Amino acid sequence: NDLPHIGHAYTSIICDTIKRFYILKGYDAKFLTGTDEHGLKVEKAANNKGVLPNKFVDDISKNFINLSRSLNILNDDFIRTTEPRHKKTVESFWNKLVKNNQIYLDKYEGWYSIKDESFFQEKELLKTNDKYQTIDGGDVEWIKEESYFFKLSNWEKKLLDYYEKNPDFIKPISRRNEVISFVKSGLKDLSVSRTSFTWGIKVPDSDKHIIYVWIDALTNYLTAINFPEIDDNNQVFWKNAHHIIGKDILKFHAIYWPALLMAIDFPLPKTIFAHGWWTNEGKKISKSAGNSIEPNYLISKFGLDQLKYFLIREITLGQDGDFSEKSFINRINSDLSNSLGNLISRTIKFTNKHFENKFPIELDGNILNSKILVSGYNLIEKYEVNIINFELNKALEKVWFFINQVNQYIDKMEPWSTIKINKVKTAETLSILIESIRLIGIILQPFIPEAAKKILDILNIDNNSRSFKFYNMKYAMKKNHPLNDAQPLFPRYNA
């Protein structure tokens, strides 16, 4: 119900990186994002602005669509929960729950947070001066109203069994342990409708009940695969689906969602991965604190690839991270401008000056099996394992270890000195360097796609020869392959 911030950008960048990785590996991959537009929180925010909810969410969704464009993410679908196709999915989902005897009508009495759009048991709240609040200090109110309930308590044992048999279902392990502990403490049936507001999808055959916003929101995943008429292709996608979420909505995705899917006899997604939060110089980002970090500001000032690189490289996926402009500038200057940018600039400029904009020599078996190139060719195996296991920063660490090896190689070989006395040896050195840069350009495409494209353009690599299939010595560059002029890739900034 507000402008997108760095946390929204972070989730999108993670998903986009993973999708680009699988595309480069030759897989068919789909990336879904969207906006959750119903509920009391949205209704109140619209009222406060003096506009109708539908006008309010139209404006909000445009901000998120524009963010996706600014981030240049490869999403295949953007689902708004106010769309007719989504309403159809939600109603079908609800009717299946009813048909399977998973829903009943009763009275709800308990604590509710408008901000979190969530019901809370007393054990989940903090009590200060006779006032209950959520752990992060949010207000809760005691409500009493008629409500439909989902028989969540019936699924406690089956959830625990599933977690045990599928240890990779919830990641990272700290979040898995958190969920298991919560479920073991006991689950109560879940209130899944409200009568105190009107902005939402109505319960079928009911005039006054609105479907709980989190059932509405979660089923957007099913809207993406055209539930309930799911074709074979979408069934394969669902079987391998990864839900990438912020840790604040883990309970809904790792407890309510699998229980709801089990209740309609529908398979569960492959993985629920909960990433951490970003703070701003040690302080939690919030609207009231006025310390929101605007992605578009960072993109316009420093560049899109710089933002993507920092967010992925700076922290382990799943942990919290702290943002400061100083640490941002230090990271991109050190890694992108110094290590990577300077390597490419000095290698290509020197080669083009002394070898007429052409790849100097044919790489024979001895050169291809040189220590530096073997290190480069072998890099991709562990890199792929890291990404498949959501260890994105570790994958980048491995790439930068290789980049540093290549920088050490150029300093050791000193082509600027050997060109005066041994042009053949210099040609070999430069050819090893340029082939290493080709590998770097290919392997960085999921993380910094615009810069990686420029690197491969400088090397004049055909657009059809940039997938991971070509990260192999049999596709090494050939003698006299034309090279383009080097261009600035990463400007330096003052901290």
Task: Place the predicted regions along the sequence by residue.
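N-terminal alpha-helical segment
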Residues: 38, 291, 375-379, 436
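Active-site-proximal binding-pocket segments
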Residues: 250, 311-314, 318, 327, ...
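Structured secondary-structure scaffolds
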Residues: 1-33, 85-89, 135-353, 395-399
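N-terminal, positively charged nucleic-acid-binding surface of large information/translation enzymes
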Residues: 1-162, 166-168
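Structural signal for well-ordered, non-membrane alpha-helices
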Residues: 65-68, 94, 98, 341, ...
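A glycine-rich phosphate-binding loop feature that marks nucleotide/adenosyl-phosphate handling sites
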Residues: 111-116, 276-278, 327, 362-367, ...
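Basic, alpha-helical terminal appendages of large translation-related enzymes
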Residues: 30, 34, 50, 85, ...
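A non-catalytic, amphipathic alpha-helix used as a structural packing/dimerization or gating element
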Residues: 17, 55-66, 92, 339-346, ...
